[in-house]
Every structure is written in C-alpha cells, then in structure tokens.
C-alpha cells in the first residue's frame, strides 16, 4: 500500500440526496427498517440491475442497560424487497421454497443473479450459520439452502461477508453471543463439496470487532473498515485482505487518516473508492459533521471527506454541517452501488427508525474536481456459459440442496468468467437445452424498434451511387524470410482472397486466475508521454526487451492515464472524424505487429505521416499477446501528443472482468511486481471506462468494435451512452456494440444465438442493410473477430471486419490488416503476413522462447478454437472459447 503524493488527483466524498420519483406503495415498500442488508444483483433477461433488501428490524426499543435504542427482536422480519434501478420501483417478492428465519445484523453477498445470506439474530436468538441462497435467475424467485460440509464460522451476528475475487465467500469478525470475534473464513464456490476454511493470513491482522463492514474491490481485495471492539470502543482502522498467487492470504493495514472511528456504518466500493457513510461512536452517539460521509481512495491511499483529503481527525462543529452530512447522521442502514451511484436505505437516527432512500452520484461530470481515481471498475457480475438452472425442480430437501450447490458454483463461475455481463439468463440443465432456450428468445426477424422509424424521405437507396468504395486491390507485405527486412510488397486482387470468410475465435475453458491485488498510488513529471514515444515508437528497430521488467513504474502509469483520461473525457461517445484516416483492428498486445504495420505503411509522427492522415484504433489493445503494456502505453502517449489525429475507441477486452482472465493482469503483475502491477492494471481499467465507443468517418462510415446486435438501430442510441460506463450499467446496447458479430455468411439473415455465450447474438446482412439505410450510412467497419486475411467483407460489402494482429494466439496463422480510407472515401486494405518461425537465430531465440511460453500457458488456460467452418468440440461449447 502506498500513500498519495502531493497533487494526487482525488475527489472529495459525494453529496447524498433523496431518490426522486421512486414507487412502491403499501406492502411493496420496505418501510421503516434497520439492521437489514442491501445487495446489488446482476441484470437478468427481464430486468436491469436490482437492489435486494432483506430482513432487518421494523421496530425499536430502548436498551435496558445502555439507555440507547436497540432493535426489537420481535419486530425482526425475513421479508424480501426488490428495487428495479431502471424503473425506480420497489416490489415485495414472495420467493418459493423455505425461507431463512427472520433476522437482522446478518451478512449478505451477491453471486451473479443470486444473493447469499448467512448468520444474524432474530426472535429465536442467533440464526444458524447455514447459507441461504435467494435465486433471482430467469425472474423465478426461489429460496435454497446450501449444504456445506465440515466445521464453519458458526452462528454469529454483526459480522460481514462478501464475494472475493469472484470466487471466495469470505466472512470476517462478528459476535457469537459469547465474545467478539477476529477470525476470517472462506468458502471456495468453485470447489465441491463446499467447505468453509478458516484462514490464517499473514501480515497485520485486525483486532476482534463487530459491526464492521467488509467490501470486495473488483480486482479481489476485501477491505475491512471500522467496527466496535470487545470494550465497546469504535475503531477507525481499515485493513485489506488479499490472496497471493501462492494461495496464501494476507492482511495489510490501509494508509491514511480516517475522518472518524465508527461502527454500525455502511460501506461500498465504486471503482477503487470505498464509500463509507454514517455510523456511531461509543455510547451510540451518531457521527456528525463531515465525518458522516467519507471515502477511502485505495488507489491514492488517502481518506477523504466532503472537503477533500483528511489530514487529521477533527470533526466539524454542527454549524458546519451541510445537508448531505445531516442526511447521513444514522446507523444500522445499508448501502449498495450500481455503476457510479451509491444507494442507501433506512437505518436509525437516535430513537427514530428511518424509511428514506438516498443516492449519491460519483460521476466525474457532476464533480467540480478532476480525478483519475474514482470511476468504477466494472464489477465482475458477468455471465457464465455453463450457468444452467432449473427453477421448477422438486422442492425436496435433497434435490433442493444439490441443485442449490450446483447453482452457486455456476453463479460464481459466471462472475469469474465475466463474459455476458448484462445477459446471463438461466438455462436448462443440459447444454442442448441451453442453446434451445436461447434460440426461443431470439427470432429470425430483426427486432427493429418501433420507436425508431425510418426517415420518411429516405428511399431504397438502389438508385444512389455510393461514395464509399473498397479498392479492387489490396496492398500486401509478403512473409518475410529470416533476416530479410526488406519485405516484398505486392498488390492482390480482392478476388484472390480465398480465406475471406474464414473467421476465427479464441477460446478458453472456465478456469480463472487467482486473485492478486494491493493498494497503491501514483504521480510523475510532465512530458512523460514524450518519454514513452521516444522509447517505444521504433517501427524498424524495436525488439522485445530481453528483461521483462516494464520501463514505467505505477507512478508514471498513473500520470499517463490521467493525462489521456482528461482528453477522452472531453470527447463525444461517437467521434466525428474526417478522411484520410487509417483504421486498425484488434492488436491484442502484439506490439511487434503494430511496429510492422507502422514500418510498412507509415507511423504517427512528424517524421512519418501524421501531418496528413489520422489514425483510428478499434479496441482490444490488451490481452493474449505478450506486450499489452507497450501497446496501450504507446497508444495513450500518441493520443496525448496528437489528440486531434490519433483516436481510440473501446473494445470488449477493455474491461477488468475480461482482461483479468486473458493475460493483461498477469502481464502487469509479472512485469511490474504484484503491488504496482495490480494498481497499474486497475488504473488502466478505470481509464478504459472513458474511451469513446464508436466513430463516424465523413458521416458515411461508422466504426465500432463489435456490431449492431439486436438492439442498435440508430447512431443516437450509441451517442446517448454516458461515460464513464461499465458493462453492468451499459445494458444491451453496450453489450451488442462490443460483443456482437455478423452471422456466418450473407445467406444467414436475422438474428441468431452467438457461440460466444448466452444472451449474445449474431446479426445478418438484412440487419446491416436496414441499419445503414436508417442512418444514411454506406459502410460499417468493425473488429472483434479474427479473420484469415486480416479483413473480410459481409452484407454485400456494407460491412468489413478488420483484424490487425497476425498469427493470433500463436496458432491461427492469419494475416493482419489495416484499412486506409482516402479523401475520396476509397478504402485500400493493407496487409502483413505472420512472421515465419526463426531458424537458429541466437538474437531472437530468447525472446521468441518467451513468446512461445507465454502463448502456450495462456492457450492452455484459454485454448484457441479451430478456424471458421471447422466443427467445434462439445467441451468448448460452453467455455470462454470465443472471447
């Protein structure tokens, strides 16, 4: 963990306000409540993200011994209420199955579209330590009790629990009725039979406490904050719990000075910022003033209140309160975050039970400060291709327990795999029925929105002469002989590209890397981007470094990301660009290919061609290849140097829950060290949330990473997506934009299920024609899929797929290509072929051996699939084979 240097970019804690316009009358509204839980569940097919409120007390009474109000156990409930973030409506749920007993002061954690509950206290005393699962999948609500073998944490209340590293349910501290506890337990949701494991972490262990909070950061660190010790003293410390690659857990004391000690507070992560609200001091006195709202910025290593960085624990007097601080003068409330918004419900203020509903928005546009540290890293609440449920199964204990175990495993795997973030729908038990159920939800007709009518004055377009034309010949750099860097350049007729329809997809199984994370910081001198360009932009002379250590430290990565982020924040979601321009497809960390393309066809420098042609990159800068760090840092540096000429949009791998699995996080750790590497990886992913999502060239060509899918009918739909944006708040439009693909060929029309996973689609040529006609476009350029010749035409030439990395995953043997769009909108493909393997080349053998090892290890984890048209093995059908 580090501390922030001077001038660190931090944003004060946000202001809270009451949620406006929410609905929920009568029994649907949770009403007065304290000691409850509030948990965010991933979107389902029929709903967007939802908040699940469970349990808690509906009445209070004066404490006999303390004179302070406490919960009335007779008023404790087990009711379940759901708040739909999109519709702003509260609904009381009545799930099938045997519910847990009424309880308060329990612990809850989300696993995909399920919520796990454990412990608590109610009218019957301490609740058991059984795990109860509320399954919301497929919008069929049902309770399940999960069977766990062996000893566990035991009955307790006032403890905390969260899902760590998208895999481990970790519960910490609490009170078992006899003593205050300091232990930590973990349950691996990917291993059956389920067993609790008592952890023995290294490092600075936190003292025994209850009424603390524990929140998991997206990259897998659990942050324990505050609490009350055995003597009743409130605590002000915070500890990070993380698991190293060896499997050993470690506690680390968080830096900084917290605004106040506290317990019975609420805390939730938004990106790298832990938002802490409310709580009480010794004797139950509510925290007042600025201390009622706090943020621990784990990236900058500082605590903040409403005024900025906290340097000493001096609470303001009551006349300094702002309205937001007064609202948060409460305890026993609950909080959850959706995107950049933090929601709070209920609680206790003195002897007054609350039923209000609050929200704060951490979006940078609403802040008068600029910060690089606070936008949200996407939650790994994404979807599992193997995630199959049968909600109509018999309710006998044996079958329920078995199915609930399977469901919990599959849900946690869904988090770890993180592929279909918005559209994980529950499938039937078999792979075949999974495909069938998806097919039933996707018809062959294109679901064009009735609210987006075609322009009345637009005719069929058959009589119009198109302005955009694909040149009849492509420029090709032939395969290079060893030692021959001259490169034979030739032109081929497009008719000679026999492999043009051979699209290919990388694959994987459902394994995931162990969690590795830390707290850290950043900052660096001015002009850093020039250093990066000078060091990396060597099109003819670049060689992979013999030493794997990266030449920038996390301090400099933070500076680079901040400078680029300020530019991206000022750009529209859909860029408006002019020709001439070069368009690049997926690079996937293959920095050598980027240098070859620059060398052969010009590079962005005043010594190159930047003075008369722009550059557009279509995303997927990281993962798979061995030099993702070089690729993304150079592109960011070029963006800073030439902000009006170099353009970057987002790909599906520019998301933490994807690039945690496919090499980028591992590369950061291996080349920068674990602490600096995880911090840098997190910082890059924060920046990715600001990237533009599409680009228009001369208002006639639209460029995107994935496609139009089933939901995108107008460019305005893309323009309305507000950044920073994460997969879980972007919904179907963002998912289609980054993930959808064309169908197999022009003969397959409409929509079809996409082999990449549940909820993802392929779109036919009819969709392309309708979209272009509706938006007065002549061409779609997209990336996302490996194609044998580096580019591929679809929909009678109205769509081109572009891929710039050669020999993808070290096995594809595909060419890489760029498209050069001239002033007359004539498009010329320019290709490079894969380099042949070296023949006893001592100079290149060590680095190529490293390349081979890197590819082999990653391909074992995520094996590439056969080329387009070859049969797919049954074992791969529900894997990550297609990311």
From Swiss-Prot:
Keywords: Hydrolase, Kelch repeat, Manganese, Metal-binding, Nucleus, Protein phosphatase, Repeat. GO terms for molecular function: metal ion binding; protein serine/threonine phosphatase activity. Its EC number is 3.1.3.16. The keyword Ribosomal protein does not apply. Mn(2+) 2 binds at residues 620, 652, 705, 784. Interacts with the phosphorylated form of BSK3. This is Serine/threonine-protein phosphatase BSL1 homolog. It comes from Oryza sativa subsp. japonica (Rice). The lineage of its organism: Eukaryota, Viridiplantae, Streptophyta, Embryophyta, Tracheophyta.
